[in-house]
Amino acid sequence: MKNKIAATILLTVALAVSGCGSGGSDATENTTASQEGINSDLKSAKESSQEVFAMDTYMTVTAYGKNAKKAVDASIEEIKRLDALLSTGDEDSEIAKLNVNKSATLSEDGGYLVQRGIELSTMTDGAFDIAIYPVMQEWGFPTKDFKVPDDATLKELLKLADVSKIDYDNKSREISFEDAGMEIDLGGIAKGYTSSRIMDIFKEYDVDSGLVNLGGNVQTYRTKTDGSKWRVAVQSPEDESQYIGVVDVSDKAVITSGGYERYFEQDGKIYHHIIDPATGYPAESGLKSVTIVSDDGTLADGLSTSLFIMGKDKACEFWKAHSDEFDFVLLTDDDRMYISEGIADDYSSDYEYEVINAK
């Protein structure tokens, strides 16, 4: 899995600094060549780039400008800080302690993410659920000790996956659970929030241009140094070294979710990690992948999984109600592609696709 994630990061970064088009069978060849032929404008700028493994994925931070190294160093420290704060797998983290003690006064970051998680749950009619963690544990996704739970167990655990049972005071940042068995996981928005924090750091250090790739969660700062938009690959859900399209963006997060990211097979059936809070089982929505493009990395992260759970028809209707906040690329199980009109002029693909209009 680590090698696959690293390959994805290389693919996306290569596209982001190159001018290559959308990918077919020669996508890997094109992007490899592009790494050697990065345009001279980017080469001439002062560049700093670092890679780190955090939040169970490889992350790359790249910045251009006179303060690029300082900005990247500060960004790497911020990634490590947020990982230590939010990880459910680290018993010393704020969230792990909350899950044990069932109440806490949260940090500013933790409180912000809990509040956003609650808001996203309301916004998506429960498709986004930070309280789903006990169900995820039963499936074995956090520990990779995979198993298919029985129906009775899932039915009981779903009673705990209820965001309305989280008591949270936004002013004091005090939080508690109404049910002693409840636990939360902020992983569904943590990387998106982290990329947004890095954008704040880039602004603080006044870098000219920048890009972060947090395990496939991409966010761009300004344009490339030559003034052109970043070209961000939309990864293929069937081959991490290929891509299904390219979107040209500046100052945007581009975040993709799909069942291909984490899954296991039992008795000939594949079970992926995107759990539908309504059923407790992996979502069967007819979608292979969902890509969200937004100014807000936290929102993009949360909606990428939420729209995957909704399925194509509900996702399109949801976007029409929130078209000023994000755009999308949907790929269905039968390889039909749908994109929202807000990115139609900036998206290219070898797939045929239908543009969804807001009206």
Where are these regions (language model features)?
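Mature catalytic core of soluble alpha/beta enzymes
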Residues: K2-K359
